[in-house]
Amino acid sequence: LFRLGVMIQMTWPGAPTITYGDEAGLCGWTDPDNRRTYPWGREDNELIEFHRQLIRIHKDYQVFKTGSIMFLKGQYKLIGYGRFDENDKIVVMINSSDEVREADIPVWRMGIIQETRMARLMLSDREGYSDEAKVYPVVNGLIHVECPPMSGMIIKDIESMG
């Protein structure tokens, strides 16, 4: 769930803020034990790299800083929202359930035309994360996605990937 929260934070409107040590897997409890010493030499390197990749995506696309937001899908433990502007159209899907969830996402609401294709920039699930692209064709203004259990995906229109 932590990585899903980070994905939302890096794609939601506003400036994302990381609390000291979160990127390394630092745990804390209630005050005064809410922040411990940084775990030098014991960092969660996979989690650090996950943060780096999401920060890179956030920096690479102006839409995350100044674009609009629109809810595209809302079901029990499954949400999808779009971030869009005149240059980029991006879908973020979050599945917090223990089951695979499938959904048709109405990308036409962000102005995506039927012949457009979209590609996944990142997938995060129980196994870790991947930036391996997967292409989603837009059919009748929709993309069909299959979200693994406890997963998040960032999907972007290919025409503006540059």
Cite the ranges covered by each PLM segment.
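Carbohydrate-interacting/catalytic domains
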Residues: F2-G5, T11-I18, D22-G162
